């Protein structure tokens, strides 16, 4: 199931449908000016969304995560650790362990957090201050409330009747 870029598109379509809006969608490059030359609206994600909001705050009409929260009273989960079903469970557990270990280092060791921010700075147009704030806004764990939000998204917006399935 490919959802990396499609997640936001699926979420936008779902939220617009709840408002009885059914616009035509066109796949375009992430150039805000170019997108708005040809279309009435544009969906930007990630760094480009943050940059677009910074430079053109008057154009921001909808924050997908905030709208989902207002609509469902549940947080939106924008990223998960996923593997193929045929991946050996021992390898999945090993990878999960490394991810959790890195998260703990990021949360508890200021120098590790700074390394991550510096890495992100080298790949983004965002400022150190904005990246530091961003990493403080992102929740990197899934609790029961987030799982409930994820399952509602998967069942309602993606029509996956079973919701999230876990290896263990």
Spans of model-derived segments:
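Secondary-structure end/capping motifs
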Residues: 88-156
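Alpha-helix boundary recognition
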Residues: 17, 35-37, 107, 121, ...
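Conserved C-terminal helix/tail region of periplasmic/extracytoplasmic solute-binding proteins
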Residues: 160-168
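Pocket-lining segment of extracytoplasmic ligand-binding domains
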Residues: 28-117
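Bilobed "Venus flytrap"/periplasmic-binding protein-like clamshell domains
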Residues: 1-40, 45-49, 148
């Amino acid at each position: 199931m490919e959802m990396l870029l499609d997640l936001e598109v699926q979420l936008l379509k779902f939220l617009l449908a709840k408002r009885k809006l059914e616009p035509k969608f066109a796949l375009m490059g992430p150039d805000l000016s170019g997108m708005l030359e040809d279309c009435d609206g544009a969906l930007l994600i990630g760094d480009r969304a943050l940059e677009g909001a910074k430079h053109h705050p008057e154009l921001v009409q909808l924050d997908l995560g905030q709208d989902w929260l207002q609509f469902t009273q549940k947080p939106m989960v924008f990223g998960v650790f996923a593997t193929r079903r045929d991946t050996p469970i021992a390898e999945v557990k090993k990878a999960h362990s490394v991810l959790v270990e890195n998260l703990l280092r990021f949360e508890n060791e200021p120098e590790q957090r700074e390394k991550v921010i510096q890495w992100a700075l080298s790949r983004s147009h965002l400022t150190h201050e904005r990246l530091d704030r961003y990493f403080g806004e992102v929740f990197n764990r899934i609790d029961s409330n987030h799982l409930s939000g994820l399952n509602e998204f998967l069942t309602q917006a993606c029509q996956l009747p079973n919701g999230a399935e876990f290896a263990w």
